[in-house]
């Protein structure tokens, strides 16, 4: 018989508001339980039926994604995805968000975001080997955004540095839409250390349920529900919903768990992340098609007089739930205690498909597992048939709407005066969204574990060395993995379908640019309210674009995260949604990391080449140039031909692996001119470029984005071999793909000629100063 702990006397409307549930939800809960829930049970349903936990608004759209592939070992549904990267090695990876917590408590919100994603990785039996992050903030001319950036970066650095996992790469962008709602997405990679992948499904009725890790407190209570609602002017009052992490306990937890997993004595494992003990127990039971009973009196706690509601909804960090072999309990507890961790048997696996919770001698919750975890509500929304009128109007924009170019200068619609192209390049380089992120990544330890091949900012994708493969060989060969996180949210805002295709294509292109083969993705879908028809249309269109690109590029989705209700409401109840931001985390494999290349030029007189697609649009529409120089966010983003995209990447990868290409850099934000400038800055070398243009819009040639384009350099010592490679592959070239020489590496100046006219002449020293100091000047 359930004891309602006197909490059956509660204000239903207030409780539903707190739990972010509707009256229809409540009626459905009563129907499933065949009775009214008590307050504790209502809280359990609140977190488990939140968008954060059950994807109730996005589940129908996620089914569009391809999830199977030749290298995929574990897809969506487990703690993280797993792929085969060759040589009997398995990579575990996933991306998660901690947006709302970071908005109100940036240091702890970001820090615990790192801790949470690391637990997803090592819960599968993998040692975390790298972290990347994708961050979004409002423009830095507002002091509150500077404070948020400082706090988030400090939190990520603190947790990652202390736990001993390198932060190897990432991206960051600034836009006014994120001023009230920053985005903090963290991706982690791990290498499997156990013979078998550790899964979460409970097995064997009667097996003990073991609690391991930190103690349980009141921090983070209701965090999942908080993450599934919009931010308002009163959100600072929700600081208790933000967890507090301890990276040193996490480090002990990593070592202890991997040690325990290797014994084979752990049957199932689940970390206590969102919704804490409620979610971990319900998912373990549901995934094993069994039940779990838990006695809260046995849960290690750090505070007195905690209620069952607080125990079950606490999101205290660094906690795990295991199903273990009964005869190995003593050995396991001793092992965990040795690492300074709490370990306590708090329940057992039961044969009935339900979660039963007792506290102080009474049953306080008894819920079918399917009701909590499997058969959760789905909110179906109508998708509008046509794009919103304001977008259709923006799609009408043409480059001819821009001012004419006179005497190698162009009038800025933003600043109402003329600038030379050299001045425009310097202005774009100093914009925080394009400028060096050195101030940020220098705070991260990117070299711990000694397997980081390129420091952040040096290459288009991070590259991490894996274990030595042939220990008997005199020539040590190390395989590696590459990873990149990407999203041009401006493109997605202007066309969610095309923009999302571009996000997948760019993330794959970045991985290919270091010489790795793109294998699979994890995604983090950051969107506004799905209850708004435009917001849901954006989400639906984005999912369609991701699905199409992943199928074409053969990079299946292994899992990820959906973060909705990313919008802020001011004191006048005016809602500001973020730009839709589907962040793509791409992973790739490379058989020999010695073959991987970076983005900077190598030697003077090396040739500079360009590859791209005629079928893919190349336009200044939706470009950084249009926004940052002319002050306009308009136009339809470039359309990418995925067949040509795939060919360009494959052709370049093979050239890299044949040691013909010595540097490579994709053309994205800022177009060709900025890509050239960045390679000059990274190498402290110049470039002499000669281009031809039939049309009179020089700005298109310099600053247009799209076109599946990559610049790369060929060693002057390898030019004969390069031309032989070109000749051998000529028969396979689609007529729509071009590859052409555009210049050579020089000493200390970026010089660009178009149709034999001097367009740009900037010393690398000047480029570097503008590029490196933009963000640091705010601190």
Swiss-Prot record:
Family matches, as CDD domains:
PurL_repeat1 (cd02203), PurL_repeat2 (cd02204)
Specify which residues bind Mg(2+) 1 according to the UniProt entry for this protein: 96, 561
Q: Where is the active site?
A: 52, 98 (proton acceptor)
Subcellular location(s) of the protein: Cytoplasm
Question: Which NCBIfam families is this protein grouped with?
Answer: FGAM_synth_II (TIGR01736), PRK01213.1 (NF002290)
Biological process, per Gene Ontology: 'de novo' IMP biosynthetic process
| Assembly and interaction partners | Monomer. Part of the FGAM synthase complex composed of 1 PurL, 1 PurQ and 2 PurS subunits.
Coarse class of the protein's main subcellular location: cytoplasm
Q: Which PANTHER family match?
A: PHOSPHORIBOSYLFORMYLGLYCINAMIDINE SYNTHASE SUBUNIT PURL
Q: Name one GO molecular function term.
A: ATP binding
Q: What is this protein called?
A: Phosphoribosylformylglycinamidine synthase subunit PurL
Kindly list the positions annotated as binding substrate.
97-100, 119, 243, 315-317, 563
Chain sites annotated for binding ATP: 55, 94, 523, 560
Q: Which organism is it from?
A: Prochlorococcus marinus (strain AS9601)
Q: In which pathway does it act?
A: Purine metabolism; IMP biosynthesis via de novo pathway; 5-amino-1-(5-phospho-D-ribosyl)imidazole from N(2)-formyl-N(1)-(5-phospho-D-ribosyl)glycinamide: step 1/2
Q: Which terms are listed as keywords in the entry?
A: ATP-binding, Cytoplasm, Ligase, Magnesium, Metal-binding, Nucleotide-binding, Purine biosynthesis
Name the family the entry cites.
Belongs to the FGAMS family.
Tell me the Gene3D superfamilies matching this sequence.
Answer: PurM-like C-terminal domain (3.90.650.10), PurM-like, N-terminal domain (3.30.1330.10)
Could you tell me what reaction this enzyme catalyses? N(2)-formyl-N(1)-(5-phospho-beta-D-ribosyl)glycinamide + L-glutamine + ATP + H2O = 2-formamido-N(1)-(5-O-phospho-beta-D-ribosyl)acetamidine + L-glutamate + ADP + phosphate + H(+)
According to its UniProt entry, the function of this protein is described as: Part of the phosphoribosylformylglycinamidine synthase complex involved in the purines biosynthetic pathway. Catalyzes the ATP-dependent conversion of formylglycinamide ribonucleotide (FGAR) and glutamine to yield formylglycinamidine ribonucleotide (FGAM) and glutamate. The FGAM synthase complex is composed of three subunits. PurQ produces an ammonia molecule by converting glutamine to glutamate. PurL transfers the ammonia molecule to FGAR to form FGAM in an ATP-dependent manner.
Q: Note the Pfam families from the entry.
A: AIRS (PF00586), AIRS_C (PF02769), FGAR-AT_linker (PF18072)
Which domain of life, per UniProt?
Bacteria
Q: Name a single GO cellular component.
A: cytoplasm
Residue sites binding Mg(2+) 2 per the record: 120, 271
Q: What EC designation does it have?
A: 6.3.5.3
